[in-house]
Regions:
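Charged, gly/pro-rich active-site loop segments
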Residues: 2-20, 82, 87-150
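Short, basic/aromatic recognition patches
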Residues: 13-39
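A generic local structural motif
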Residues: 24-27, 49-51, 68-69, 120-122
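Short beta-strand segments
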Residues: 35-67
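Short, surface-exposed beta-edge/turn micro-motifs
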Residues: 35-38, 52, 59, 78-80, ...
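Short, surface-exposed beta-strand-loop junctions and turns on beta-sheet-rich folds
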Residues: 46, 70-72, 150
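A short mixed-secondary-structure module that forms the rim of ligand-binding clefts
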Residues: 54-90
Length: 150
């Protein structure tokens, strides 16, 4: 049975000891660079979409691979998107989240494609013909962390 406070909310023995802190721009970029799994969100024709992608940061932009006939392939045309990356610790009720807002485009530059094909971090989890590279050029990057005060 869940213990409840007088207000009817579940009791939390130490929830008040945690708070959100905004992360600086460079901290956000460092976390994006150190991780390679995120979620891309955008407004599709009929409904909002959010899908997981493996990505890599390269020269200030995020890149991911997809199949030319996938739903993500619609992002080869310019679209406004959000890339969300996080790391959560449910047991300790701590974690961080980064959101990169930007515009997408297909990658066609030979030098960029050569670098992306060589990246070990840009291997999709699912198999298939994932030959289309999508770039997200950031317009805004923000992040926050929830943790105990130090």
């Amino acid at each position: 049975m869940i213990s409840r406070s007088a207000a009817g909310r579940p009791d939390s023995d130490d929830r008040s000891e945690r708070h959100f802190l905004a992360l600086g721009h460079q901290q956000c970029l460092d976390l994006l660079d150190a991780h390679h799994l995120g979620r891309v969100a955008w407004q599709a024709a009929d409904l909002p979409q959010i899908l997981p992608v493996t990505y890599v940061m390269h020269q200030g932009s995020a890149y991911f691979r997809t199949a030319p006939d996938s739903i993500l392939a619609e992002l080869s045309r310019p679209a406004s998107v959000a890339l969300e990356v996080d790391e959560l610790d449910q047991q300790n009720r701590s974690g961080w989240s980064i959101v990169m807002h930007g515009r997408t485009s297909a990658v066609s530059e030979p030098e960029a494609l050569e670098d992306l094909w060589a990246s070990d971090s840009l291997v999709p989890w699912a198999s298939g013909n994932r030959t289309l590279f999508i770039r997200i050029r950031p317009d805004r990057v923000t992040g926050r962390i929830v943790q105990r005060p130090t």
